[in-house]
UniProtKB/Swiss-Prot annotation:
Transmembrane residue ranges: none
Purpose of the protein: Required for the assembly of mitochondrial cytochrome c oxidase.
Name assigned to this protein: Cytochrome c oxidase assembly protein COX19
Lineage, highest ranks first: Eukaryota, Fungi, Dikarya, Ascomycota, Saccharomycotina
Region of interest: Disordered: 1-28, 73-99
Matches recorded under InterPro entries: COX19
Residue ranges with Basic and acidic residues bias: 73-91
C-alpha cells in the first residue's frame, strides 16, 4: 500500500503565495515602526483608524527599503501615496477647535 495517491513517487513541492509572504525581520530593522503600529491598533481596539494606516505605511515603507518585501504602489496597498493624501487622512481624525 502506498501513501501517495496513484503510486506516484514524485515529491510534492509547495509554491509560495503571490502576495502575503512576509520574511522575518531577523535584524530588527523595522521593529520600532512595527511596535508603533501595533500600539496604535491596540489603542483604537482594532479599528481601521486613519492614523494607524499612516503608521502601517511607515512600517511597510521600512520593510520595502530593507528588502523585506517587494515594492508596490501605495494605492495597491490601500494607503495614501503622497503628503497631500496623508494630510487629508489626518484631518479626518483631528478634532477641530471651537466645536
Amino acid at each position: 500500500m502506498s501513501a501517495n495517491p496513484g503510486n506516484s513517487l514524485k515529491a510534492l513541492s509547495p509554491t509560495p503565495p503571490e502576495r502575503g509572504s512576509f520574511p522575518l525581520d531577523h535584524d530588527g530593522d523595522c521593529t520600532k515602526q512595527m511596535q508603533e503600529y501595533l500600539s496604535c491598533i491596540k489603542l483604537v481596539k482594532g479599528e481601521n483608524a486613519p492614523n494607524c494606516r499612516l503608521l502601517a505605511k511607515e512600517y511597510l515603507k521600512c520593510r520595502m527599503d530593507n528588502k523585506l518585501m517587494d515594492r508596490d504602489d501605495w494605492k495597491h496597498l490601500g494607503l495614501p501615496s503622497d503628503k497631500k493624501e496623508a494630510n487629508d487622512v489626518t484631518k479626518e481624525t483631528t478634532p477641530t477647535s471651537g466645536q
